[in-house]
Amino acid sequence: MKLLVTGAAGMLGREVVAAAERLGHEVAAWDLPECDLTDAGATLAAIRRLEPRAVVNCAAYTNVDAAEADEATATLVNGDAAGNVARACAAAGARLVHVSTDYVFDGSKREPWIESDATSPLGAYGRSKLHGEDLVRAELPDHAIVRTAWLFGPHGPNFVSTMLRLATERDEVQVVTDQVGSPTFAGHLAPALVDMAERTDTGIFHGAGAGSCSWYELTLEAYDAAGVACRVLPTTAEQFARPAPRPAYSVLGSEREHPITLPPWQEGVRAHLAALEEVPSR
């Protein structure tokens, strides 16, 4: 299958390209500056020219805190650009797998969020991603929107890698205990996205590491697996204020007949550590 991966130089995109190539697909890997997805005309022309069977859109503005001060850019990249890709896929007869986020939810539930739950993002990042979802649904029937959560991997900035770095610089760290989610290793999600590109079912899917934990528990697991001695002190989101609000509970579940099933998040942490050994510059 001819597969186009957008955002191919990013943390998730690189894993999707690798997974697709391992499976023997013909892969086109796009990222800036070769193709600017915010340019509707250029995106349409490029995808029509390539004629892929499917597109996996990993391109995104992912700085949750920075989005609060620059919502226009976040909306352009996460929203309008996603609509441009969907419109181009419709013209080219391609299926679209579009990656979204748990931050479309407000965190008010205390049980896993399913695909049909009402969305109500708390911040600019979540609003921008929800705008992208809306445009994809409006522009292209043959789509799969895959919401994931707390993504980490060796090829980009992420919470787990940051905490591992801090452990080499400090004797102790403070981490919040009152935000709970589904940590997801990019290397586990990527093959599921490639598989979704080959499927025919459409709509919204949730794809995240199995299980749940707080940021505090995730840090403890990472330090234990890495064998580091840095102390982890509990704190709260109120005490550890950040520019962007985050949902208190964004664990993802699924109501789909054929759900995306990923390994437990703890396995993802161990796989991440192993992958970091192969990417020493990270």
Label each region the model flagged.
Residues K2-R22:
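N-terminal Rossmann NAD(P)H-binding glycine-rich loop of SDR-like oxidoreductase domains
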Residues T6, W30, C58-A59, L96-T101, ...:
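SDR active-site strand-loop-helix element
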Residues E21-A45:
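Adenosine-cofactor binding site in Rossmann-like domains, unifying the SAM/SAH pocket
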Residues L37-G79, A90:
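NAD(P)H-binding glycine-rich loop region in Rossmannoid oxidoreductase-like domains
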Residues A69, L76, A81-N84, V104-V146, ...:
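Catalytic helix-loop patch of NAD(P)-dependent Rossmann-fold dehydrogenases
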Residues A92-A94:
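A short helix->loop->beta-strand "cap" motif at the edges of active sites that frequently abuts
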Residues D134-G181, G187-H188:
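NAD(P)-dependent short-chain dehydrogenase/reductase
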Residues A192, R199-A244, A248, L273, ...:
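Mid/C-terminal beta-alpha module of Rossmann-like enzyme folds, strongest
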